[in-house]
């Protein structure tokens, strides 16, 4: 999916996260800020990468402000933000699990 506009999803509340997406030329840039980065940073990055790969996002700036969200919340917030920021196109719902 091509990112064409800025979008937000999520909150700054405990056990949630805020995802900010913006269009950018070049490669995909992912920035993760988390209160639990030392314990779960690798897992958070893996979930973010897998979700973006499943949605075929190859360019853009993705900023994740995590407050201890579970993997399912990370996926849901990323999916919401990407769909808000992407070009209008048919969605393959089978890729969103």
Swiss-Prot record:
<comment type="function">
    <text>Covalent carrier of the coenzyme of citrate lyase.</text>
</comment>
<keyword id="KW-0963">Cytoplasm</keyword>
<feature type="modified residue" description="O-(phosphoribosyl dephospho-coenzyme A)serine">
    <location>
        <position position="14"/>
    </location>
</feature>
<dbReference type="InterPro" id="IPR023439">
    <property type="entry name" value="Mal_deCO2ase/Cit_lyase_ACP"/>
</dbReference>
<dbReference type="Pfam" id="PF06857">
    <property type="entry name" value="ACP"/>
</dbReference>
<protein>
    <recommendedName>
        <fullName>Citrate lyase acyl carrier protein</fullName>
    </recommendedName>
</protein>
<keyword id="KW-0597">Phosphoprotein</keyword>
<comment type="similarity">
    <text>Belongs to the CitD family.</text>
</comment>
<dbReference type="InterPro" id="IPR006495">
    <property type="entry name" value="CitD"/>
</dbReference>
<dbReference type="GO" id="GO:0005737">
    <property type="term" value="C:cytoplasm"/>
</dbReference>
<comment type="subunit">
    <text>Oligomer with a subunit composition of (alpha,beta,gamma)6.</text>
</comment>
């Amino acid at each position: 999916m091509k990112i064409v506009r800025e979008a937000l999803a999520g909150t700054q509340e405990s056990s949630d996260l805020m995802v900010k997406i913006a269009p950018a030329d070049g490669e995909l840039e992912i920035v993760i800020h988390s209160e639990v980065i030392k314990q779960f940073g690798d897992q958070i990055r893996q979930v973010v990468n897998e979700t973006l790969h499943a949605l075929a996002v190859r360019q853009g700036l993705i900023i994740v402000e995590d407050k201890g969200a579970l993997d399912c919340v990370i996926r849901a917030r990323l999916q919401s933000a990407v769909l808000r920021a992407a070009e209008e196109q048919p969605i393959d719902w089978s890729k969103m699990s």
